[in-house]
Amino acid sequence: MSVRLRFLSPGDTGAVGVVGRSASFAGFSSAQSRRIAKSINRNSVRSRMPAKSSKMYGTLRKGSVCADPKPQQVKKIFEALKRGLKEYLCVQQAELDHLSGRHKDTRRNSRLAFYYDLDKQTRCVERHIRKMEFHISKVDELYEDYCIQCRLRDGASSMQRAFARCPPSRAARESLQELGRSLHECAEDMWLIEGALEVHLGEFHIRMKGLVGYARLCPGDHYEVLMRLGRQRWKLKGRIESDDSQTWDEEEKAFIPTLHENLDIKVTELRGLGSLAVGAVTCDIADFFTTRPQVIVVDITELGTIKLQLEVQWNPFDTESFLVSPSPTGKFSMGSRKGSLYNWTPPSTPSFRERYYLSVLQQPTQQALLLGGPRATSILSYLSDSDLRGPSLRSQSQELPEMDSFSSEDPRDTETSTSASTSDVGFLPLTFGPHASIEEEAREDPLPPGLLPEMAHLSGGPFAEQPGWRNLGGESPSLPQGSLFHSGTASSSQNGHEEGATGDREDGPGVALEGPLQEVLELLRPTDSTQPQLRELEYQVLGFRDRLKPCRARQEHTSAESLMECILESFAFLNADFALDELSLFGGSQGLRKDRPLPPPSSLKASSRELTAGAPELDVLLMVHLQVCKALLQKLASPNLSRLVQECLLEEVAQQKHVLETLSVLDFEKVGKATSIEEIIPQASRTKGCLKLWRGCTGPGRVLSCPATTLLNQLKKTFQHRVRGKYPGQLEIACRRLLEQVVSCGGLLPGAGLPEEQIITWFQFHSYLQRQSVSDLEKHFTQLTKEVTLIEELHCAGQAKVVRKLQGKRLGQLQPLPQTLRAWALLQLDGTPRVCRAASARLAGAVRNRSFREKALLFYTNALAENDARLQQAACLALKHLKGIESIDQTASLCQSDLEAVRAAARETTLSFGEKGRLAFEKMDKLCSEQREVFCQEADVEITIF
């Protein structure tokens, strides 16, 4: 069932259009067909690279909802994994035996090169066997802990069922509550162990082998294959050619296996402007944990008229481990590596012609280093700068012309070449596989338009960066973590003063962004992916994460002597300590000094260092708004959240996404030199009254944020002449209330006070002004002071007179503050009968004020989840008068409260909502009755606990 396949490189898909449709219903146009024929002959290294999926361990994340553990599924995957690991270990042991036997039979030649390389390969396999044995022991330990927790959970569940059949008593209820907590803890432990076990499942490399059909596959047909494994997806498109061959846009994809997800495959036939679903099938991943690559044929249709051929290859370790350790199932098989090693001839000393060619290649590099200009791309860049460049700079220079190889023979002859370097230039980027896969991932899942700003491509050489934030991610919105998007790095080599300033910034105490970024992403993953606000926020945060760099990561410059020394010592292969992958890639002829170890992947570097944007102002802004996003997402994950509160939270999430999008297009070199906010954000000039206040809080170089205490003092200084005389003693309180509203997103988030280290950004302040529709800040502050005074009056004598004024124009002037709504609601319980009637009547009359009602509903719905029983009771009564049917589910849930007063208020409010309220109350009453019946069943059962 062989199928002739052609795969298009990512660079060719733009011209080919992958499987694009023409304007007519005829499918491909003739021009597109001609472009396909031209692009087939191109061979891109990147198309041969596996597109590595982003790691999405579905259970090992904070803030996600703990699902019910599935021990049988975990047992099945564990047994398959253990079987595959043992098989893998046997293969490694057989390889070691073969190398040991060959080591004994090898005679030492004059150069000793082959003998030493064979010895290195033997030690490498031994290290890999030890690593595999540790891997197996770790998996066994995790599963043993999982089984213990499973038995504890089963025992607690049995005891809970037994106690449920006991006569109802206080002791039985307490025991049931304790058992419920134990059950929850055991389930959480099992869930965490499942997440830890998923990390050890390795990777599946799935390669497309083509569609097989009989009468169904016709020339010109377009097909789309979609594969899903949990949250990971791979969509590829193909076309049936006239010679019965098939053209597909991708060849291989790496998936991270999970414990509870299987591989779903869906095939769709593209017809003109429509599509027809051919079939869908699900494959059990437990069958994929085998050492050797296996070709599977999947029946897409029920009758088997169309089959899909796939090659599945399992790697017990991830790609990063694969790059630094041997693996028989890697991109280069063990057989090919043995062939390249055993048939290898020790290289001779470089000839005069080769040394001359090296010196010619080195001259422009030396000049570029001395002059500080951009360097020409050559293979020497990979040899000399592999540990000096950032990963993004390496990825920019991966596409090398074939003439840059300084091999004097055919580069394809990698096994018998005796030149200075026997490795093909096209294979060099394979050493940097993770970065290439990240770029392919960015191409595979492009961001929707408008989420991230359009990045202008860099002009000139790969190092000729323009200052500013807009050009720092020039190639793609999703770049590797080494992408330097701070403005000082590119220009620091040309201006000593700027270099010193940048160095001072980076060496000083900064803001750590790695933790907040990961926390926000972990909170975003378990959320509802159908919400566009959350999806767009995730894309925006991912864009920032991929462009952050490790702290103090600077470009180092080497002299001409060190560059020459690096080149000459690349032939010191006898002293090199190479991993097997690098040895096979370079043919054993390239080496590094022992004191110049191979640089680790960028992902390992980034993980061991804190990430920074390179500009202190940007770090502060990102930190503040990431903390706001974290608080919003935590509240979104709360149980029994009302739809009203959820919509308000999603609106604020969209606002934070807009702020991050604005930050991504700012020129932060300009920010560092700005003296006023209008220079950075011209739209800020529309709020002239607020700008004067903000200018008093900021200074040159830091115009987008200020400490909360500074803004507090500036507010006092600005408004003291209007407030002190008319409202004595209210200035401090009014200023603090305003800042609390700014920080808590208008009362949406719980207030955490105003510590001195709290930072307030311009975007938070401007968002507050927009939310309150402030055109005159002085007038707004006066109304806020009146409301603060009103709160005090509601706690003093003469409350009835004050409450009666809460109507009409006076009601419309209120924000209202959370303190106002709280005091108003509590008057229904704590006041005199006359005051209670007045407070209830004014709340009922406030229904006509739409703005007030929305804010009041939001506050009182949040109050239902508080631990204050008096506030819960008052909130229920307030929702009754406001006709808050939007919160009917939250109100009905309080009908099961332990306190009679809260239950009565919740029952009264729920039944006041008409037919919907009656149905909700009956539903809750039915649940209560079922629970009571469970307690009363089999009352004669006696339980003895030792």
From Swiss-Prot:
Annotated region (Disordered), positions in chain: 390-512
Polar residues composition bias: residue spans: 478-495
Phosphothreonine modifications at: 345
Keywords of the record: Phosphoprotein
Pfam families linked: PL48 (PF15903)
Chain segments annotated as transmembrane: none
Family named by the database record: Belongs to the RIPOR family.
Name under which the protein is recorded: RIPOR family member 3
Organism: Homo sapiens (Human)
Record gene name: RIPOR3
